[in-house]
C-alpha cells in the first residue's frame, strides 16, 4: 500500500512467530562520501531522541513496552547502501490489553526518525562521540576476525570499483573525519531524498490481509502520522 509516491507499506502475514516486526528501510546509492555519515546516523537513531533524550531513558521506555527490541543496521547490497531501523515487539494475543502496542511502537518510530537529539544543527556532540568510539571499536574488532579480514581482502581482488574495495583504514579515516553536523546533514539528506525499499514491513499474525482490512489497519495504527514527502521517479 503506497503512503505517498515512492514510499510503500508492505504487509507480510505470518503465524510462525510470537512477535511482530516493523522495519523502516532506506536505500541510497553507495557513495564513499556518505558511507560514514550513514553508519553514524544509524547508530545515533537507536541511542536517543527528543522525547527520550538519553540512552537510559530510551531503554527504560522500550522495557515498558513489554521488552520491545529496537535496532539499526547499515549494510551494502550490490551498489546500494541500505539503512534499516527495526522494532520487534510481542503479539497482541499475549497481552491483557489488545490493539494498543502497535500504535505505541509507531509513535516511537516517528519520534526516532523525525525528532533526533539536535544541538547547533548537528547530532548531540556528547552522544555522537560515544557512538563514534563504539563504531570504531566494533570495526577494529571485526578486523581481528580472520573470516571478516579474508572477506575484505577478497573484495579488493574481486571488485574494480573503489566503493566496493573500501579498505578498513580508509573507512576508519572517514569515520574519524565525521562531525555531528556532517552526519546530521547526511541523515537529513537520506530522510528527505533516499528511496524507501520495503520501507515499513509489518509481520502480521492472525490478521487477514485484504485490501479493506489493510486500509483500516493503516488508519487505526496511525501510519498517517509519518510526514513523508513524495520521492521523485
State each model region's role.
Residues 45-49, 113-117, 139, 143:
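Sec/Tat-exported extracytoplasmic proteins
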Residues 1-65, 171, 184-233:
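His/Glu-rich zincin catalytic helix
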Residues 70-73, 116, 182-185:
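Short, charged beta->alpha transition segments
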Residues 41, 105-113, 210:
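Short amphipathic C-terminal alpha-helix that caps PH/PH-like domains
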Amino acid at each position: 500500500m503506497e503512503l505517498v509516491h515512492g514510499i510503500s507499506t508492505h504487509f507480510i502475514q505470518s503465524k510462525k512467530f510470537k512477535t511482530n516486526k516493523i522495519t523502516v528501510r532506506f536505500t541510497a546509492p553507495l557513495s564513499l562520501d556518505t558511507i560514514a555519515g550513514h553508519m553514524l546516523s544509524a547508530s545515533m537513531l537507536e541511542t536517543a531522541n527528543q522525547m527520550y533524550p538519553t540512552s537510559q531513558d530510551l531503554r527504560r521506555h522500550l522495557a515498558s513496552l513489554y521488552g520491545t527490541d529496537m535496532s539499526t543496521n547499515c549494510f551494502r547490497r550490490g551498489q546500494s547502501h541500505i539503512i534499516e531501523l527495526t522494532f520487534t515487539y510481542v503479539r497482541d494475543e499475549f497481552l491483557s490489553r489488545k490493539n494498543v502496542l502497535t500504535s505505541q511502537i509507531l509513535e516511537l518510530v516517528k519520534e526516532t526518525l523525525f525528532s533526533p537529539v539536535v544541538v547547533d544543527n548537528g547530532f548531540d556532540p556528547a552522544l555522537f562521540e560515544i557512538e563514534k568510539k563504539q563504531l570504531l571499536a566494533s570495526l577494529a574488532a571485526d578486523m581481528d576476525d580472520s573470516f571478516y579480514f579474508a572477506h575484505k581482502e577478497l573484495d579488493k581482488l574481486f571488485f574494480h570499483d573503489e566503493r566496493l574495495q573500501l579498505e578498513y583504514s580508509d573507512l576508519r579515516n572517514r569515520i574519524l573525519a565525521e562531525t555531528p553536523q556532517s552526519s546530521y546533514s547526511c541523515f537529513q539528506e537520506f530522510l528527505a531524498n533516499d528511496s524507501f525499499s520495503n520501507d515499513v514491513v509489518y509481520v502480521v499474525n492472525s490478521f487477514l490481509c485484504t485490501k479493506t482490512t489493510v486500509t483500516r489497519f493503516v488508519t487505526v495504527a496511525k501510519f498517517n502520522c509519518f510526514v513523508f514527502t513524495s520521492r521523485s521517479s
